[in-house]
Amino acid sequence: LGLQLISGGNGLLDLLNLNQSTRLNLIRSFDPLADQCDVFFIDVPAGASDSSLSFVNASDKVLIVLVGEPTSFMDAYTMVKAAHVEGGVKDFSVVVNMAENEIQSKDTFQKFNKTASKFLDVKLRYVGYLPHSRALRSSIVKRKPLVVSDRKCRESLLFKSMSKELLSSPNNIASGITFFNKSAI
């Protein structure tokens, strides 16, 4: 059926300050899309606003995008902790972005996993990495997905591998409202 994406980009920053009733109504408003997509991505900004947490906690799977920088670690840890404490989320998938190579990405993940596991009863799963590359940068500038323009390049193959890992990861058991009882990532 396809893939749908709700971007957390600049145009949606006003969603950060929604009241609880409006957030719940917004989550329910996606119900008609249930038959129109196989996977539904919700991209929330870094940090742990009430709106971001509502969307994360309503999702079957949570994907944390981590960069090997202190601010990224702090934002990711804050989101993991808040989603776990407030929403009972226990399983998180992690992709390392802008890594030099796979070895560096796994090292970055291990450092984050060690810290998070020390203080939180959560399970973090490494699903892959994306390199710091010209191809990805060009794709962003052109606003054309790399997996469409060059399906066989290294980055496209990494996306495919990450997708398989993510889809095979366990779903979280939500205690509250969820997105149309279908995979919301």
Task: Please provide the spans of the model-predicted regions.
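P-loop/Walker-type NTP enzyme "switch/lid" segment
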Residues: L1-D35, I140-K142
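Mobile beta-alpha loop/short-helix "lid" or hinge segments that flank ligand
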Residues: L1-G2, G8, A48, L130-R134
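Conserved, well-folded catalytic cores of nucleic-acid-processing
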Residues: G9, S29-Q36, A58, A82-E86, ...
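A conditional alpha-helix N-cap/helix-loop micro-motif detector
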Residues: N19-R23, P45, F73-A76, F159
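Conserved active-site and cofactor/substrate-binding residues in soluble primary-metabolism enzymes
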Residues: S21, D107, R154-L157
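Conserved catalytic-core segment of NTP-binding enzymes
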Residues: V39, V44-G128, S138
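Beta-strand-loop-alpha "switch" segments that mediate conformational coupling across diverse proteins
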Residues: L120-V147, F159
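NTP-binding/hydrolysis catalytic cores, primarily Walker-type P-loop NTPases
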Residues: V141-I185
